[in-house]
Amino acid sequence: MSPNVDDGERLHRRSFVFDLHIHGPGFVPQPFRSVWRGLTVGAPAEVGFDALRKGGVDAAVAKAVGDPIVTRWYLGRSPWDAVEAQLARIERQASDAGALVVGSVDGLAEARAQGTPAIVLGVEGADAIGRDVDHVDAWHERGVRVIVLVHLRDNVLGTTCLPWQRYVGPLPVRRHAAAGLRPLGLRVVERMTRLGILVDVAHADRATLLAVVDAATAPVVSSHTGARALQDFPRYLADDELRAIASTGGVVGLWPYRYRHAGVRHITELIAHARHIADTIGPEHLAVGTDMNGVPGVMAGFGDETDLPKLTAALLDGGFSDREVNGILGANALRVLRKVEEHAHRRPHR
């Protein structure tokens, strides 16, 4: 056993552990959820938010999915209403697990002081906004504090790095527009920044990501990704993309994804990604995004949040200091949310 296992456990319990990207169980409605689970038999079993407490996780961003890969299965509902149904479900699940839904950094601190896991609401795939930028305000009023602009298909805001067909296999994909951030996407980014909603470019292609960063006046994140220098997987980021996100003061989340031949096979490979990213942009720009309940597969030895203490020990084994690991586990992400909040408060609201 690694000598850092006990040290990792102690450090994990002392740290503010913040997962930037999870989903609530059952976000795909039945009977379609059973079909999805049948197609992804290697995926870990879905778990409830009680796994956060068991895994020593203080907070997580739980995201509804706003693109048609999920919303189309909410039969008889508009994409907007499908997202609302998911957000309401997350709130019920949080309540059932004894977690608090919060909308500010102060709320995160209050939840931790009470010894209660905190849930921050998010949306992955802003397709449901349609062409109405004021929908961003409605989501903010609803409590949403993180939005992933694009998900598994291009939308009216920008373009994705990996359409859903490419996860399934070499299927044809019709791209309807040139890659990059659309004018409407720019307006959405500006509105999010003004309101204090964190911009998440996970799933964005290179052109969209760089355009978002170019327009950014507050930190930008990619909540679940890896280093493309280590594997040529479209969901991973090239070094200049990593540097672009770091230039905003943002973070990139370590992602335990493994499906078919893509992603990390085991925790040693995940630490290699952490090491490369830290060497490229500094450990202060690293975070964690497990994608709990949202991935078709994960690395060996990892099932859900209860396995996160293994990551803490492995980071120590990988040469990261206690302070650096504390940052990766959550302090860096907390810093980003605080800066996004402060930036919004400094801006005059029209």
Regions inferred by a protein language model and the residue ranges of each:
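N-terminal hydrophobic targeting/anchoring segments and the immediately downstream early-domain regions
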Residues: M1-R174, R228, D232-V288, M292-R350
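Loop-centered beta-sheet repeat module
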Residues: P172-V213
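Short hydrophobic/aromatic-enriched beta-strand-loop microsegments
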Residues: P219-T225
